[in-house]
Amino acid sequence: MRAANLTISIPYLGCDKNCPYCVSKMTGYPKPNSGKLRRNIDKTKTLARAAQVTNVMITGKGEPTLNWNTLLDIIERFQEWPVELQTNGLLLAKHLDKVNTLAVYGLDVVAISIDKIEQFNDFKDLFKRIQDVGMTSRVTLNVTKMIPRTATFNYFISICKQHNIDQFLLRNIVAPTHAQVSEYTEWIKENTSQAHYDKLVGEMNVCLDKFGLFLRETEFGMKIYDYRGVSITRSDYCIQDSSTVNNLRSLILMDDGHVYTNWYSKASRLF
């Protein structure tokens, strides 16, 4: 059994952003157990090595930076791998000194989720601080009706260049396959447009065909390019639940301290 990555869900201590397309609100919250999570870290590392994991992604059912001490502990204990943090960026933008702390503990990539154009400017000092401490910044642009259709792919790349953003991910917002109908799935249905996402992808493909440099392709089909000095890719389906017979998308160390191979299946628990 091989796994593309190890994903660690920091035990939930709330969220400071109320995203109407929040995946966690559609898939539920396991009961957090920080003690069990810490006790299972060594086992998880052994499994990750055996599965030839190449990177660690830290995320959360809430905002991981709100559980600050646990976050730092996890980063420090997994720093033998490249470590990425997925965050809404709000806490870090208010307390830029925390970016320095993350770097000291061994974080490599800060991936910031954005769903409004003005957030690029709101986070300009955060992007600069990430660059100053030598970490890599990524913007994940969540494509909904909150993003104007008039905004082009090249427009977003120009913003990335302006703010020294290293990586740009275009993300299609869809409801998880196994999610029950709720106000959140209905919001996605009413406030996303496949045509809007396809328009940006079409513009991206034209730019990449003319001036892009293909860099690599991940095991699960994400193609990564260099365009104007920015790393470019896209995610057509935003949930990491696809696996093959021999290769897992992720090993998942969940809030409850157990390791799973699927976000939605309790039966996928390994230990």
Task: Name each model feature, range by range.
Residues M1-N40:
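Canonical Radical SAM [4Fe-4S] cluster-binding loop centered on the CxxxCxxC motif
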Residues K31-K36, D115, Q119-N121, D125-S243, ...:
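Radical SAM enzyme [4Fe-4S]-AdoMet core and its adjacent flexible, acidic
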Residues T44-I58, N67-C160, D166, L170:
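Radical SAM/AdoMet-radical enzyme domain recognition
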Residues K61, N88, D256-G257:
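Residue-level recognition of short loop/turn positions
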